[in-house]
């Protein structure tokens, strides 16, 4: 494959990412929107964890972003706030494909975050209030006591916590990878110097 065609075809990486995710949703048995999110702490030590990608935004002309939700006081929330950058990879074993993303971060704590929070189950909404994410916890019993307290305080229609919301990654690099025989994989990298620059696309060695 000397030029982009087939599964790599298209002029907008966000549209392409959406298409790949849609295929994964039809074939991947568990959490096709799971991503391994990487951040760094103040000392530059990397951290990685699995989170769920909730939206691939596509605004046309090669602009868009990737959105997930978290507690802003968590380790990842604090590291993202400090660095303003993050990376992730999503790998689909059923498709033998993956997407890697590196980019700049910003919080999404307006109506979009409110709407997503409201779409969650009541127990998940209350859990967001109860969990002081990433902080030490004496016991599971203590956590459940916090859940009971929050349930009594918030009732059946809790508002989104001010410390919980979305994070948008606006990419500077997106790589689309597909497995090839004898490890001769196909890799295409979309890259730009800033979010306002046009994308440059190149094939990479396996």
UniProtKB/Swiss-Prot annotation:
The question of whether Nucleotide-binding is a record keyword is answered with no
Please name the pathway. Answer: Cofactor metabolism; pyridoxal 5'-phosphate salvage; pyridoxal 5'-phosphate from pyridoxamine 5'-phosphate: step 1/1; Cofactor metabolism; pyridoxal 5'-phosphate salvage; pyridoxal 5'-phosphate from pyridoxine 5'-phosphate: step 1/1
Q: What is its EC number?
A: 1.4.3.5
| Subunit structure, interactors included | Homodimer.
Q: Which UniProt keywords apply?
A: Flavoprotein, FMN, Oxidoreductase, Pyridoxine biosynthesis
Which species is the source of this protein?
Answer: Jannaschia sp. (strain CCS1)
Q: How is the cofactor bound?
A: Binds 1 FMN per subunit.
Is 4Fe-4S found in the keyword set?
A: no
Binding-site positions, substrate: 54, 116, 120, 124, 183-185
Provide the protein name. Pyridoxine/pyridoxamine 5'-phosphate oxidase
Q: What is the lineage of its organism?
A: Bacteria, Pseudomonadati, Pseudomonadota, Alphaproteobacteria, Rhodobacterales
Essential cofactor(s): FMN
Report the Pfam families cross-referenced here: PNP_phzG_C (PF10590), PNPOx_N (PF01243)
Q: Which HAMAP family match?
A: PdxH (MF_01629)
Q: What class of enzyme is it?
A: oxidoreductase
Question: What is the stated purpose of this protein?
Answer: Catalyzes the oxidation of either pyridoxine 5'-phosphate (PNP) or pyridoxamine 5'-phosphate (PMP) into pyridoxal 5'-phosphate (PLP).
Which InterPro entries does the annotation name? Pyridox_Oxase, Pyridox_Oxase_CS, Pyridox_Oxase_N, Pyridoxamine_oxidase_dimer_C, Split_barrel_FMN-bd
Gene Ontology biological-process entries: pyridoxine biosynthetic process
Q: Where does FMN bind?
A: 49-54, 69-70, 76, 98, 133-134, 177, 187
Q: Which Gene3D superfamilies match?
A: Electron Transport, Fmn-binding Protein, Chain A
GO-annotated molecular function:
FMN binding; pyridoxamine phosphate oxidase activity
């Amino acid at each position: 494959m000397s030029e982009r065609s087939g599964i790599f075809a298209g002029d907008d990486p966000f549209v392409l990412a959406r298409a790949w995710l849609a295929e994964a949703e039809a074939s991947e048995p568990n959490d096709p929107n799971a991503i391994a999110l990487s951040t760094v702490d103040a000392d530059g030590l990397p951290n990685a964890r699995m989170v769920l990608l909730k939206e691939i935004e596509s605004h046309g002309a090669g602009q868009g972003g990737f959105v997930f939700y978290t507690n802003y006081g968590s380790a990842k929330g604090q590291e993202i706030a400090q660095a303003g950058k993050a990376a992730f990879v999503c790998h689909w074993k059923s498709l033998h494909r993956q997407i890697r993303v590196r980019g700049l971060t910003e919080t999404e704590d307006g109506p979009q975050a409110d709407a997503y929070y409201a779409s969650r189950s009541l127990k998940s909404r209350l859990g967001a209030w109860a969990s002081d994410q990433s902080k030490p916890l004496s016991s599971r019993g203590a956590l459940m006591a916090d859940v009971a307290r929050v349930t009594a305080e918030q009732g059946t229609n809790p508002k989104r916590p001010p410390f919980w919301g979305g994070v948008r990654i606006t990419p500077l690099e997106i790589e689309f990878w597909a497995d090839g025989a004898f490890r001769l994989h196909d890799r295409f990298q979309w890259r730009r110097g800033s979010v306002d620059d046009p994308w440059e696309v190149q094939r990479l060695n396996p």
